[in-house]
Every structure is written in C-alpha cells, then in structure tokens.
Amino acid sequence: MSLALRGELVVDKTKRKKRRELSEEQKQEIKDAFELFDTDKDQAIDYHELKVAMRALGFDVKKADVLKILKDYDREATGKITFEDFNEVVTDWILERDPHEEILKAFKLFDDDDSGKISLRNLRRVARELGENMSDEELRAMIEEFDKDGDGEINQEEFIAIMTGDI
C-alpha cells in the first residue's frame, strides 16, 4: 500500500523493544500544531487553542483533561502554556498510544461504510482525500497484493498485517 497513511502507522518492531521515542515527523507535527493553533502568535496557547491543537493531533480530549493540563503546566497563571510544556504533554500522550489501537483507528478511517472490509470504493475515496491520483487498476493491484483470502477486499486482519509488516 503506497498511501501516506501506511508510512505513518507502520510499527517498527525494533523500536517497541527499546525505549520508544518520537520520529522526526511526529516532532514536526507537534510543532506545526502548536504554531497553527497559537492564533494570536504569542508563543503560548490558551484553553481553546490547546483543545483544538490536541484534536488536530488525534486526541479526543475532554474539557476536564484540557483544564488539568492548564492547571499542571500554567506556572505563571496566565491561562496559557508554552510550546515546551505542550511538547512535553503531547509527547507523553503519543508515546502512551497503543500502536495496535492506532492501526484499528486507521482501518476505521478506510472502512467508512462499516462493512469490516476495505473495498475498492473505500480505497479510491482515501486515495482521493490524500491527493493521490491513482487509477482503479492501480488501486485493484494494491488490494490484490495484500488480499490473502482472495475476496477482493482487505479485512481487518489483512490490514493489520500490512501495517505491521507481517505479510
């Protein structure tokens, strides 16, 4: 599967054995989210900016979570946190993510019709959303390459194998 999503989610088994660290891409995503949602460009983010930045990074944060982060990290009582604090919080949260759970979330992004499988239609939609200009022939070839049970679609088990490199 040549879509960008695969590259972001492939689980590196050697890293799981060592202390996990963020990739350069993940570090850049954190920086970009902070800069994008620091709307007043004061090098700190408030409650609303923090909540939106966390959501942009894939976290479904509750009001209580955001308030706790602000309480724990707002040392100057400004109602805001700095990039350094944001980076510390988000890095911890990212490293606590379960890679298997992230793969299942990605599968659900493809399987928007809840069929339990990724069809040609699902794959075509995702490719289009990612700006990939791929023909149906190319998309079918991708499915065929990983479709171990030969049903013309990618089921959850096959998707997990793709994403973990257990093909």
From Swiss-Prot:
The gene is Cetn3. Pfam families: EF-hand_7. Gene3D superfamilies: EF-hand (1.10.238.10). Keywords: Calcium, Cell cycle, Cell division, Cytoplasm, Cytoskeleton, Metal-binding, Mitosis, mRNA transport, Nuclear pore complex, Nucleus, Phosphoprotein, Protein transport, Repeat, Translocation, Transport. Monomer. Component of the TREX-2 complex (transcription and export complex 2), composed of at least ENY2, GANP, PCID2, SEM1, and either centrin CETN2 or CETN3. Interacts with USP49. Ca(2+) 2 binds at residues 147, 149, 151, 153, 158. This is Centrin-3. Belongs to the centrin family. InterPro entries: CALM/Myosin/TropC-like, EF-hand-dom_pair, EF_Hand_1_Ca_BS, EF_hand_dom. GO terms for cellular component: centriole; centrosome; ciliary basal body; ciliary transition zone; cytoplasm; nuclear pore nuclear basket; nucleolus; photoreceptor connecting cilium.
